[in-house]
Amino acid sequence: MNQSVTRPRPDAKALGKVGVLYGGRSAERDVSLMSGKGVHQALLSAGVDAHLFDTGERTLAELAAAGFDRVFIALHGRYGEDGTLQGALELLGLPYTGSGPMASSLSMDKIMTKRVWLQHGLRTPAFEVLDAQAELRTVPDRLGLPLILKPPHEGSTVGITKVAGYSDMKEGYAQAAKFDDEVLAEQFIAGRELTVAVLGTGAAAHALPVIEIVAPGGNYDYEHKYFSDETQYFCPADLPDAVAAEVADLAVRAYRALGCAGWGRIDFMLDADNRPWLLEANTSPGMTSHSLVPMAAKAIGMSYAELCVSIVSEAACKVHSPARNS
């Protein structure tokens, strides 16, 4: 798990004019602003001609006219991570980092992600999809308590509630329903919280060292993700070699099952029997000072700047039109 990733060092000048797309209009805008600024500074330090572009304040027409040769997507959540932007970039013929429209859309939808994983025989907690007509009082009878309620299309723990008792179901549902028409109710897996960064595409996709996250009181919420210095991270995680290998292998299989490309992150819970359970996929992970992908890269000797350059060097359009008859 600790072997270095060996790849040729990209020529910064050959990358051309790079746009760092950040900000946006999702509930994760503030995180994206931090990610984008970090990526921008890292690319500049590596000699890349990089420019910030806030998709929440500027138009698609302005993006098309900006003269970028490629873009680094440092957006999180809706409109930036859900396939919407990726489809627009395909139409513009502008190479971009990360997954294509389909994989981005699937991965952003936690319900569809779990359905794909189950179809591939990959372990993920039991779940139900709730709407306004759902009989909330009966859900714990099937999924057990505690359970998790979350909006299917948000990240960074936005709108998530850990429901401890029947009386908490209504409030937890209302919190998640602020963000989505449907709510994902998920079996709670007690254990250790793990995450695995994956770099590459297809057969070349490979896992970086497993990270364990230990938040105060087990509460890895928005504050503890991005601002708290109390959260502890262990990279590589202190796991038996066989368990670490299983988690890394499952991360790559989960990533490939969704058709992810370029880079991403897969989140897990590890139960008391050392069985990993897939939680969700992130196709545009955070790149802040507290973020996990840079931490995993550092563990194999890859600096933050090297990581950013490596990711943007693989920017590409993912939808290929069939050849036209002349």
Curated annotation (Swiss-Prot):
The keyword Nucleotide-binding applies. This is D-alanine--D-alanine ligase. Coiled coil: none annotated. ATP binds at residues 140-195. It is found in: Cytoplasm. The gene is ddl. PROSITE patterns: ATP_GRASP, DALA_DALA_LIGASE_1, DALA_DALA_LIGASE_2. Pathway: Cell wall biogenesis; peptidoglycan biosynthesis. One of its GO terms (molecular function) is D-alanine-D-alanine ligase activity. GO terms for biological process: cell wall organization; peptidoglycan biosynthetic process; regulation of cell shape. GO terms for cellular component: cytosol. Cell wall formation. Its cofactor is Mg(2+); Mn(2+). Belongs to the D-alanine--D-alanine ligase family. Mg(2+) 1 binds at D267, E280. Mg(2+) 2 binds at E280, N282. Residues 114-313 form the ATP-grasp domain. It comes from Bordetella petrii (strain ATCC BAA-461 / DSM 12804 / CCUG 43448). The keyword ATP-binding applies. It catalyses: 2 D-alanine + ATP = D-alanyl-D-alanine + ADP + phosphate + H(+). Disulfide bonds: none annotated.
